[in-house]
Amino acid sequence: MRFFLDSANIDEIREANRLGVISGVTTNPSLIAKEGRNFREVVQEIAAIVDGPISAEVISTDAEGMIAEARELAKIHPNIVIKIPLCAAGLSATARLAQEGIRTNVTLIFSANQGLLAANAGATYVSPFVGRLDDIGHDGMDVLRELVEIFDIHGIATEIIAASIRHPVHVSAAARAGAPIATVPFKVLMQLVKHPLTDLGIERFLKDWESVKDK
């Protein structure tokens, strides 16, 4: 399973990229708004740091508006993937953009049926929101597992991005479910790196080394 970073914070993206474990970045209007910077500038800067897919989301609610935005975003950098919400207009826009060779990441997916529709429209990626489903008492991993199974049965090339990841358990569960990609917040990525026994082991090794290095 590959990792994307779900962030628009340049410092976080730089630090995560230095680890050598992220293959792409996902953003959304909320994440970019938190940075208080120009949208295009942020996306350009991310593209200069990470050599992989960078999802940038449209804000229009009609198909024609989404398509127009997508065409402009796609001009920023070859790695830009257009993030489009799952709705009737979004499906229409996705189908048109696929015909033009513009890659898409259909987001805000909460059922396997929605993911299947997006794939049929020509989406490059689909992003089921695991954590938000958990928030309303559903099992987000059940939806993810169902979607993975359906795509496998039918040989669907669209890649699944496990999204709305809240904690490390979501990550390992997504990997077990067969998701090819998980997009994780910086905080969760750092939680994956750390383990108290690892820290204790390093401390013990250093202590043992100090006791013998001058002998």
Curated annotation (Swiss-Prot):
Gene name linked to the record: tal
Name the UniProt record assigns to this protein: Probable transaldolase
Catalytic activity: D-sedoheptulose 7-phosphate + D-glyceraldehyde 3-phosphate = D-erythrose 4-phosphate + beta-D-fructose 6-phosphate
First-listed, main subcellular location of the protein, grouped into a coarse class: cytoplasm
GO BP field: carbohydrate metabolic process; pentose-phosphate shunt
EC number assigned by the record: 2.2.1.2
Gene Ontology terms for molecular function: aldehyde-lyase activity; transaldolase activity
Pfam families: TAL_FSA
Record key words, sorted: Cytoplasm, Pentose shunt, Schiff base, Transferase
Function: Transaldolase is important for the balance of metabolites in the pentose-phosphate pathway.
Pathway(s) annotated for this protein in UniProt: Carbohydrate degradation; pentose phosphate pathway; D-glyceraldehyde 3-phosphate and beta-D-fructose 6-phosphate from D-ribose 5-phosphate and D-xylulose 5-phosphate (non-oxidative stage): step 2/3
Organism in which the protein naturally occurs: Heliobacterium modesticaldum (strain ATCC 51547 / Ice1)
